[in-house]
Amino acid sequence: MKIALENMPRSPFSMATTPQALSELMDGIDIGICFDVGHANTMGLIDGFLELKDRFVNIHVHDNMGATDEHLPVGKGTVDFPRLLGGLSGYSGRYVIESRGVDDAVQSQRELRRLLA
């Protein structure tokens, strides 16, 4: 079994909102990262979290406009998915699509597959 910590958007109850905070929490512990793309985008920290990609166990995929955690379909917000996926070169784990409904999930799946092809 592999345990992972998820990066979270800024809130009074979040521990791991920055790459540095997440790295410090994991220091010396055999634990992975559940990388949430949308959460990182709300903090403007996608590139910083990509520096920790060797510890990614899975990736939560959704888009937003950069201010709040909207769970928009892939390609409908401000996440630069081609750049993100380029930064994930060599990643072989799971992508978990997060959406507000089935139609949005299917749309995200199609777009993600297109980008990964």
Predicted regions, residues:
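Histidine-acidic metal/acid-base catalytic patches
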Residues: 15-34, 40-117
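Aromatic-lined carbohydrate-recognition surfaces of secreted/lumenal glycan-active proteins
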Residues: 1-13, 35-38
